[in-house]
Amino acid sequence: MATQEETFKKLVAHCKEYGFVFPSSEIYDGLGAVYDYGQNGVELKNNIKKYWWDAMTMLHENIVGIDASIFMHPTTWKASGHVDAFNDPLIDNKDSKKRYRADVLIEDQLAKYDEKIEKEVAKARKRFGESFDEEMFKQTNERVKANVEKRNALHKRFATALNDSNLEQLKQIILDEEIVCPISGTRNWTDVRQFNLMFSTEMGSTADGAMKIYLRPETAQGIFVNYLNVQKTGRMKIPFGIAQIGKAFRNEIVARQFVFRMREFEQMEMQFFVRPGEEMKWFEYWKEFRLKWHKALGMGDENYRYHDHDKLAHYANAATDIEFQMPFGFKEVEGIHSRTDFDLSQHAQYSGKKIEYFDPELNKSYTPYVIETSIGVDRMFLSVMCGAYKEEVLEGGDTRVVLNLPAVLAPVKACVMPLVKKDGLPEKAREIMDMLKYDFHTNYDEKDSIGKRYRRQDAIGTPFCITVDHDTLNDNCVTIRHRDTMAQERVAIDDLHTILSKACNMRETFKKLK
């Protein structure tokens, strides 16, 4: 059986082979941590964005969307705190010359303790069977107790160092835990230092008159500076939200794990404006709703979990992540934050504008508090691909690679195939494709054997293959083959639209969010 690392490498290769993701500028040997989405990748990505956008703006009558500019007045980023506080703690290994985020090295060490604990629990569960009491085992097994104690002690030191921004303590933790460089295997570390993540450029025609501006590191600020515009023109009443999908840019020194951490990425963010004092109620609401949204895709409830922050951002009074089980461990795909009134108050201070809301029920004005949901499109894309990628051994020893993608997200919903390239079958298949293509992304394939064509569609996650044979010309029926089960059934051509609609329409998925 392949290790998780080997499976992940196969997935990355699969993404390139089947037109999901390509290295950017590959003819020039590529550009580090920059990727292009291919013909199937862009369809999957667009479907993810539509699933999010509709869940926000269609299911919630008090949420509207905007599309703010990437370039913003530079004072925006001074007000938001990004100029002074948007940093990562970095450390170098003197032997390998490689640079790492100090906090990530320590988080990986915490994960190793968790893995040791889970390994002991798994062995005991297998040994004792149904009579196994996991909690009692954790409380009494000496090896588990020792690892729990080490983990808790490390977690406490780590949280304290982060909250105090104590770079010396972060390095000391790395030394005390004997964390080695993955490349050199040595513990020859430099001091930890802060590095600002924003890309800057200049706007203007001359060097003397140019203004220093930034590529936005997040989409949220475009929402905050448009709060008054949207609230007034939309006659919005508290509570209400503003949603946005757009590109953001961060000069990540340690960009890694394929599209998980990139320098150019896409965000789906929603800022929800509420009365001060009600923010925790809405924080819990969005925390629950967003997890439901992920689980509704059917990628396995056990693959999701919450992770509360050890250190809160400068703007937050509560924060949690929704993590997905990637081949390289549980990793964040979405963050839910209670941002208080920090952003609106800062922009009011720096702009000199009054940014408030008059509440007719309370008969007073106030600066709203904000609950944020922020999800990375690229991380969501990767989580879906990781959850869907399967290598199966079939009866008779044959194998197949299949993407068990949720039908609502699949790049192609159906592929229409004539059994042979003659006898009027291609013409009939084209007729069926023309009938479906206005409502569903549909492919046509007549090359190679029917078995090879099935495998090609399995590899890109197409839920249905529709085969036109000689009987079709007489009975107006086709064979529809289901991707996950490979089961085949004979159905009337007139029923195809209904079958695909039921499986691929987001309405059925949205019902799970109630």
Task: Name these PLM-found stretches.
Residues 1-514:
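NTP/phosphate- and nucleic-acid-binding module
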